[in-house]
């Protein structure tokens, strides 16, 4: 009975949203040139064209209707010489003639509609989202949220940031690779691994592509990848995801200071290129938006030890309200405090962490570990990097220290035998950087479909 009631309800809804196509009399649709909406411009003035789009807005009076159609971020104004009722997001195929725009709006031209068809015969139901929808509803209906202006802007911003990153790498002779995401090794600690059965063998979703980049870098000199990584952390902060886009690079024949210079160049170049392309689109939605502006001064550096002493001197407490001591992890809130005070709201490198704070592969010199985290205003860490250990025995000691069986890493250990060289690399959290640049409140907003402990859908 319940199934029958549901079917009746669906049938009733379909009848409600069913809509008739419309056409002027005696038009020959074969005389209209088909063109994609994105390619329509004023060079087609007075020409007959046919195109396809989605209703962005619709208003009508007793004798005329104004419809905005959207596709590929472009909006076209259509004028229909009769009253029609079309819901937002309904799909239309339109036959019309381009005319000069007679309205007081931003459109350069308008389409005098001669006919339209509703694709599938049904217009879209009432849209279930609006600017007042709560966070969970927006995440539950993220597939529909992509039709909203702020999420359309997100898609544009995501695309522009990926382009800006790749432009830096390609302009600086990096080689892009596509390493595997099913692995039998760990990089960041076994507690954060997603384990799965791989043809009756244990395997994991990758935490990082670093080890594979290290095998490629000796061949190409500089390698990078932009791939998903996975962390089984039950963290509920605004900057953590269980699946995220990991921008990683590895460079050979490089020293520690050069590595940090490369990271800084990447950040500066990417931000400049990103805003150059996306800022006009942001301003259309938020005219008061202020982009991130970096100082011309080189990013400051502070050692882990000096940072702890600085926090103590500033009477800045840990999350449990006790004093910091050497050996403590520096919390997210304390990273932000360092940025605001020591960093003067500019990015800073936090460097030379204790050995037991970093994985088996990090290299050391007389000053300590050659490690760096780039902290960024508003969020904290966005990049983690280090020089890599190249001595075979030191690597074995690192595995032993972390209680890791080195046998699955035999291929990685070969790198220490077959022509090792000074090399280093880093990983950048793409969603974190996008969150900073777009002034989002959470990485949930800077990912297409959020994946975290409480969410694996849609």
UniProtKB/Swiss-Prot annotation:
GO terms for molecular function: asparagine-tRNA ligase activity; ATP binding. Gene3D superfamilies: Bira Bifunctional Protein, Domain 2 (3.30.930.10), Nucleic acid-binding proteins (2.40.50.140). SUPFAM superfamilies: Class II aaRS and biotin synthetases, Nucleic acid-binding proteins. One of its GO terms (cellular component) is cytoplasm. Transmembrane segments: none annotated. One of its GO terms (biological process) is asparaginyl-tRNA aminoacylation. It catalyses: tRNA(Asn) + L-asparagine + ATP = L-asparaginyl-tRNA(Asn) + AMP + diphosphate + H(+). It is an enzyme of class 6 (ligase). Its main location: cytoplasm. Its EC number is 6.1.1.22. InterPro entries: Aa-tRNA-synt_II (IPR004364), aa-tRNA-synth_II (IPR006195), aa-tRNA-synth_II/BPL/LPL (IPR045864), Asn-tRNA-ligase (IPR004522), Asp/Asn-tRNA-synth_IIb (IPR002312), NA-bd_OB-fold (IPR012340). PROSITE patterns: AA_TRNA_LIGASE_II. It is found in: Cytoplasm. Keywords: Aminoacyl-tRNA synthetase, ATP-binding, Cytoplasm, Ligase, Nucleotide-binding, Protein biosynthesis. The keyword ATP-binding applies. The keyword Protein biosynthesis applies. Belongs to the class-II aminoacyl-tRNA synthetase family. NCBIfam families: asnS. This is Probable asparagine--tRNA ligase, cytoplasmic. It comes from Enterocytozoon bieneusi (strain H348) (Microsporidian parasite). The lineage of its organism: Eukaryota, Fungi, Fungi incertae sedis, Microsporidia, Enterocytozoonidae.
């Amino acid at each position: 009975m319940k199934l029958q009631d549901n079917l009746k309800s669906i049938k009733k809804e379909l009848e409600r949203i069913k809509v008739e196509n419309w056409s002027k009399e005696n038009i020959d649709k074969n005389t209209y040139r088909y063109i994609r909406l994105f390619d329509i411009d004023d060079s087609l003035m007075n020409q007959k064209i046919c195109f396809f789009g989605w209703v962005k807005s619709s208003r009508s009076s007793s004798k005329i209707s104004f419809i905005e159609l959207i596709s590929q971020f472009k909006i076209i104004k259509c004028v229909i010489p009769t009253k029609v009722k079309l819901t937002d997001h309904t799909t239309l195929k339109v036959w019309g003639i381009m005319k000069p725009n007679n309205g007081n709006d931003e459109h350069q031209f308008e389409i005098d509609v001669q006919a339209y068809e509703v694709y599938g015969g049904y217009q879209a139901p009432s849209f279930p989202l609006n600017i007042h929808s709560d966070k969970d509803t927006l995440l539950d209906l993220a597939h529909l949220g992509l039709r909203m202006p702020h999420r359309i802007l997100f898609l544009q911003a995501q695309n522009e940031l990926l382009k800006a990153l790749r432009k830096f790498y390609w302009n600086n002779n990096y080689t892009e690779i596509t390493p595997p995401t099913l692995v039998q090794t760990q990089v960041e600690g076994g507690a954060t691994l997603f384990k799965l059965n791989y043809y009756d063998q244990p395997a994991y979703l990758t935490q990082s592509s670093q080890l594979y980049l290290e095998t490629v870098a000796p061949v190409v000199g500089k390698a990078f990848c932009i791939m998903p990584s996975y962390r089984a952390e039950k963290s509920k902060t605004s900057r953590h995801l269980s699946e995220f886009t990991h921008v990683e690079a590895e460079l050979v024949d490089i020293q520690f200071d050069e590595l940090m210079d490369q990271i800084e160049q990447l950040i500066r170049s990417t931000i400049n290129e990103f805003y150059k392309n996306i800022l006009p689109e942001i301003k259309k939605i938020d005219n008061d938006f202020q982009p991130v502006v970096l100082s011309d001064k080189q990013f400051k550096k502070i050692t882990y030890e000096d940072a702890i002493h600085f926090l103590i001197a500033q009477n800045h407490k840990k999350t449990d309200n006790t004093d910091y001591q050497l050996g403590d992890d520096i919390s997210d809130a304390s990273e932000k405090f360092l940025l605001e005070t020591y960093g003067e709201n500019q990015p800073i490198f936090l460097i030379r962490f204790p050995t037991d704070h970093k994985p088996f592969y990090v290299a050391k010199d007389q000053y300590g570990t050659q490690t760096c985290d780039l902290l960024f205003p508003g969020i904290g860490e966005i990049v983690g990097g280090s020089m890599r250990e190249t001595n075979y025995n030191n690597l074995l000691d690192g595995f032993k220290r972390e209680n890791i069986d080195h046998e699955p890493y035999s291929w990685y250990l070969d790198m220490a035998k077959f022509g090792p060289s000074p090399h280093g690399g880093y990983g950048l959290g793409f969603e974190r950087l996008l969150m900073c640049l777009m002034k989002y409140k959470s990485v949930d907003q800077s990912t297409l479909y959020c994946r975290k402990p409480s969410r694996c859908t849609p």
